[in-house]
Amino acid sequence: MKQIYILLIALLMGLSANAKSSGTCGPNLKWHLTDDGVLTISGKGGMTDYSYSNRSPWYDGQNIKRIIIDDSVTTIGDDAFNECSALTSVNIPNSVRAIGNDAFRGCSSLTSLTIPNSVTTIGKYAFSYCRALTSVTIPNSVTTIADGAFGSCYALTSVTIPNSVTTIGDGAFSSCGALTSVTIPSSVTTIGKSAFSYCRALTSVTIPNSVTTIADDTFYNCIYNHRTTKTNQKYPSVNL
């Protein structure tokens, strides 16, 4: 029995010794993870896109508390930091132009977020299930809020949608249960299916005359007043 214990300990020590703490994450990018949970992405250019079948090398990074991205990184890949549940701080530099699908999905300890004006694309479900996120400002470089981008951000109370946005995707803010009000800018023409569904605290929505398409169930299971401008004949003001 003693020999079995010794073998098990040796095996565990070997696994620990072989655990990777650095490597590559793009053609010209490297990553390094410290023992105290700081993940650094360094180099120049775009990150690799990851997926369910091709996880990032630091996946299952419950100990990642902070992410530092060099100011020469241009894209954050799909699924890059998915389920980094202990993450509380991330800097997104002004060099980043695109944030991939599911990039920060399930980062449930992230409370605040600054998206720089360099970002033009925020992928589908990029920040979904960031349960502790309380506010977010979307830069005026973004034209589309993708499907599910901020869905199930349960603590989100405030969101700023800039005048550059023309489309709010399906489920973009679905199940943001703490969101109390939202102003849709006059640049928006399309609001997708279930975009604000299950936003149970939502009390007011202003829909501008620019909106020509409101998809099914956009405000499903919400108790709210929505107002439109006088010139918006397609969606007159109602009290539901």
Per-region residue spans from a language model:
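Sec-dependent signal peptide recognition
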Residues: 2-8
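Hydrophobic h-region of N-terminal signal peptides that target proteins for export
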Residues: 10-18
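Intrinsically disordered, low-complexity boundary segments flanking structured domains
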Residues: 11, 53-57, 147
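Surface-exposed repetitive/solenoidal architectures
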Residues: 20-84, 105, 125
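Generic structural marker for isolated residues within well-ordered, non-membrane alpha-helices
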Residues: 6, 100, 169
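Structural signature of tandem-repeat unit edges
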Residues: 38-45, 62-75, 85-98, 108-121, ...
